[in-house]
Curated annotation (Swiss-Prot):
Its cofactor is [4Fe-4S] cluster. Pfam families: Fer4_7. It comes from the Bacteria. Its main location: membrane. NDH-1 shuttles electrons from NADH, via FMN and iron-sulfur (Fe-S) centers, to quinones in the respiratory chain. The immediate electron acceptor for the enzyme in this species is believed to be ubiquinone. Couples the redox reaction to proton translocation (for every two electrons transferred, four hydrogen ions are translocated across the cytoplasmic membrane), and thus conserves the redox energy in a proton gradient. PANTHER family: NADH DEHYDROGENASE [UBIQUINONE] IRON-SULFUR PROTEIN 8, MITOCHONDRIAL, NADH DEHYDROGENASE UBIQUINONE IRON-SULFUR PROTEIN 8, MITOCHONDRIAL. It is an enzyme of class 7 (translocase). This is NADH-quinone oxidoreductase subunit I. [4Fe-4S] cluster 2 binds at residues 76, 105, 108, 111.
C-alpha cells in the first residue's frame, strides 16, 4: 500500500467518514414528510386489473354465463377450481357445481383470461376473511351472489381494461 492510500484510510477510519455519510442520508430522509397510508381509514386507488375475490357473472336476461367448458379448471395452476356439469334438454352444457377453494388460489388470473364468455372474473374485493377453513370455500351460489352484487363495478372495470387488451 502506498503512503497516500494509508493516510487516506487512516483519516477515513479516524474521523468515521462512512458513519457521517450514513447519518447525513438518514437525517435527510428523517426530515422529509411521511408517505405512509393509514390503511383502514385511507385506501389507495386500485388498478382496473387488480385481482381480488372471484365472481360468476350472468347475462342481462339472468342466465348464468358459464358454459361448463372447464378451461378455467384445466388452466388453474393451484387446482383450486372444481367444476361438474350436465347436459340440458336443448343440448347445451351448464354447471351443476362450481367451487373455488380460496385457500389454494394464488390469484394469478388465468381462469379469468381463459374464460371464452367472461363468466369468471376477479373483482376488486380484497377485504374478506374466514374464521374457519370452510369459510374460504366458495360455491357456485356464493360466486353468483358476488357477481350479482358487483356487476356494475365489474362491467366498468372490464370496459376500462378493454383498451389495453
Amino acid at each position: 500500500m502506498s503512503a497516500v492510500a494509508s493516510i487516506k484510510e487512516f483519516f477515513n477510519t479516524f474521523f468515521l467518514l462512512e458513519l457521517l455519510k450514513g447519518m447525513k442520508l438518514t437525517g435527510r430522509h428523517f426530515l422529509s414528510p411521511a408517505i405512509t397510508v393509514q390503511f383502514p381509514e385511507e385506501k389507495t386507488p386500485l388498478s382496473p386489473r387488480f385481482r381480488g375475490l372471484h365472481a360468476l357473472r350472468r347475462y342481462e336476461n339472468g342466465e348464468e354465463r358459464c358454459i361448463a367448458c372447464k378451461l378455467c379448471e384445466a388452466v388453474c395452476p393451484a387446482l383450486a377450481i372444481t367444476i361438474e356439469s350436465e347436459v340440458r334438454d336443448d343440448g347445451s352444457r351448464r354447471t351443476t357445481r362450481y367451487d373455488i377453494d380460496l385457500t389454494k388460489c394464488i390469484f394469478c388470473g388465468f381462469c379469468e383470461e381463459s374464460c371464452p364468455v367472461d363468466s369468471i372474473v376477479e373483482t376488486h374485493i380484497f377485504e374478506y376473511h374466514g374464521e374457519k377453513r370452510g369459510d374460504l370455500y366458495f360455491t357456485k351460489d356464493m360466486l353468483l351472489a358476488v357477481g350479482d352484487r358487483y356487476e356494475n363495478e365489474i362491467a366498468a372495470n372490464k370496459e376500462a381494461d378493454a383498451a389495453y387488451r
